């Protein structure tokens, strides 16, 4: 009997020791690095046409040490609404942020509030772009409005603080300062949110000469004439040929430079602009020049982002935080890099719909893996909460990505994705909504002046040049997608909702 009792005592002590050890383990830190308008094709880990000419080694490192998602789709491809989706885990019609013009309701439930309640120290540094004051954060330093690329104002502690330097560097500087001064006894949730590579694309002084002596490859659809689809895409106002204007092409500047900065920046562009004007280029030659000026400045802005991602990763390494910090890199949406002759986003077409998502989670993710499931920015909030080990509210509409991160896609994972864009008239893009299963895509333009559908077979037509809506060979597929579209609108509580 004594030996049995002794065995029981030893067993209890072992279990208690295990429980004590488990309770001593901190939940993982979460570092969410979020950029603005970062196209998949501008991250070399995605292997696109720009991968060799514009490598992104630090972003590629996250992919090499973690998981790259090939099909992360946004729910509403425009800046402020996408940010609201990330914070709330709800579609735009439920979180109230339909367009860039709306003010975010900070009184509602957000992931930052829930993580703070769960014991996390929370901070956001960089681009906010939601008009209201951030809530749910122990610390915030956010750009005023859209922000500028040089010498930004950061709003914190009730006042705007002027900083001198390049904004991408400064956002990282301030993120690192917060990491240095945070309460090290608590896990942290840090949202480092860059303005870059949003237009108007003003590179760092150190990058002005990068790509200078090369021709960046043109996309095959640069001179799209928009035939084969509804009239909607032809009504755009985001053409590289006609709509970039002097600020986007660096004939005028948006930032307020110091005299020293202006001398270097203007010194680079002025002589090149004068040489261009003497050429008097017209037609396709002018479009090609515009494209080279645009894409080089865009990629220069991305280069600064990549360097600063490297600074954050280095800090985690040097301070023993890398093994217990989940690093998540994404953007508010994709972006046009000349495809269909465009810049900007908004459309449900592929380059705008897809956003990058790369995650590193040591000990949980098999390094250098790729996921091809349909995931969404709608999933981010619940993923943060699940990583933290805290409850996911039932009114959130996404799915936690943690099973996928561990390499085990649930059998009932989503097979389709619902999209809805509301900001009518922005860059000439009409209200539209739709559904995709990754192979096929159905888009509805409900406006009275259009009242039209588009349907694409993405396997046969990956560039979405020819709508096959009405084609008899796709009758069953289109009918099934319409049924699925109606089901999703009911599931997401939008069945009776149209643009106001």
Residue ranges and their predicted role:
Residues 1-10:
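Bacterial N-terminal signal peptides that target proteins for export
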Residues 2, 14, 18-453, 462-500:
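Formylglycine-dependent sulfatase
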Residues 459:
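Residues forming the ATP-binding cleft of Hanks-type serine/threonine protein kinase domains
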């Amino acid at each position: 009997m004594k030996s049995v009792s002794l065995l029981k005592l030893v067993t209890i002590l072992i279990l208690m020791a295990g429980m004590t050890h488990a309770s001593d383990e901190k939940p993982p830190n979460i570092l969410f690095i979020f950029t603005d308008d970062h196209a998949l094709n501008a991250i070399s880990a995605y292997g696109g046409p720009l991968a060799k000419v514009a490598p992104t080694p630090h972003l590629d490192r996250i992919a090499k040490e973690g998981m790259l998602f090939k099909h992360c789709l946004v729910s509403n491809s425009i800046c402020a609404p996408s940010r609201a989706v990330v914070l709330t885990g709800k579609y735009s019609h439920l979180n109230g942020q339909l367009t860039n013009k709306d003010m975010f309701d900070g009184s509602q439930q957000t992931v930052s509030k829930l993580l703070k309640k769960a014991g996390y120290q929370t901070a956001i540094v960089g681009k906010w772009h939601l008009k209201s004051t951030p809530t749910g954060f122990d610390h915030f330093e956010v750009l005023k409005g859209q922000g500028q690329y040089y010498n930004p104002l950061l709003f914190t502690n009730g006042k705007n603080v002027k900083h001198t330097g390049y904004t991408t560097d400064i956002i990282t500087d301030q993120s690192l300062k917060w990491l240095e001064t945070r309460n090290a006894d608590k896990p942290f949730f840090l949202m480092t949110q860059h303005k870059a590579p949003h237009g108007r694309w003003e590179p760092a002084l150190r990058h002005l000469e990068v790509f200078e002596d090369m021709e960046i490859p043109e996309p095959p659809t640069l001179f799209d004439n928009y035939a084969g689809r509804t009239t909607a895409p032809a009504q755009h106002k985001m053409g590289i040929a006609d709509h970039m204007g002097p600020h986007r092409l660096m004939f005028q500047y948006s930032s307020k430079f110091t005299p020293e900065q202006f001398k270097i920046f203007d010194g680079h562009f002025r002589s090149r602009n004068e040489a261009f004007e003497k050429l008097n280029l017209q037609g396709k030659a002018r479009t090609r020049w515009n494209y080279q000026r645009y894409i080089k400045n865009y990629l220069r802005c991305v280069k600064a982002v990549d360097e600063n991602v490297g600074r954050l990763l280095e800090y985690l390494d040097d301070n023993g935080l890398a093994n217990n910090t989940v690093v998540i890199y994404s953007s508010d949406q994709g972006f046009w890099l000349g495809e269909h002759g465009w810049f900007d986003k908004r459309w449900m077409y592929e380059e705008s719909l897809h956003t990058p998502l790369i995650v590193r989670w040591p000990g949980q993710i098999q390094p250098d893996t790729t996921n091809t499931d349909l995931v969404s920015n709608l999933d981010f909030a619940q993923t943060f909460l699940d990583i933290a080990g805290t409850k996911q509210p039932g009114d959130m509409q996404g799915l936690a990505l943690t099973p996928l991160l561990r390499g085990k896609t649930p059998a009932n994972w989503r097979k389709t994705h619902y999209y809805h864009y509301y900001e009518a008239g922005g860059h000439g893009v009409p209200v539209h909504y739709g559904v995709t299963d990754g192979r096929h895509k159905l888009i509805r333009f409900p406006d009275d002046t259009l009242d039209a559908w588009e349907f694409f077979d993405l396997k046969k037509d990956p560039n979405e040049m020819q709508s096959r809506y009405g084609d008899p060979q796709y009758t069953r597929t289109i009918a099934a997608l319409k049924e699925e579209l109606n089901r999703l609108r009911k599931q997401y509580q939008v069945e009776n909702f149209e643009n106001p």
